[in-house]
Amino acid sequence: MAQPESSADFGIAQQNNYYCYWQSLPSAIRVKQEFQPSQSYRYGNWYARQHGSYLLSGYSYGCAVDGNGKDCFSAHETPEHTAGTLVMPKETTPLAENQDEDPLEDPHLHLNIEESNQEFMVKSEELYDSLMNCHWQPLDTVHSEIPDETPK
């Protein structure tokens, strides 16, 4: 009868089959990993020991298969980014820096705020009056007669 695999055995097997590399970190601050041959497995399987390493938010990492299958990157072929390859944005032109006004704003448009507010109030009062005149009046009881008056 086969014994069930413990979680510790699974963790060791997983460490022996995979190693991770950082893609976004410059080489100066990249987390160095030590690669050592596994004592429990033969045929050159390697595993990564990470001392005090942690995942930095905003950086992606990838894993490559190691061991029995072909691996995408060996420990010596891990791609590294140098600090000199950063692309710096072009500087803004002095013309763009001196533009304080919104280009969509009409410079010749002059509004009278008080007049606009009065027009708005007249329209809203007309709307309010028309809504109040057209709604039904509540009846006192079910047997009350419906008023016959129409607004004039």
Swiss-Prot record:
Superkingdom of the source species: Eukaryota
InterPro entries: TSAP1, TSAP1_C
PANTHER family, A to Z: SIMILAR TO HUMAN CHROMOSOME 6 OPEN READING FRAME 52, TRNA SELENOCYSTEINE 1-ASSOCIATED PROTEIN 1-RELATED
Protein name: Putative uncharacterized protein C6orf52
Species annotation: Homo sapiens (Human)
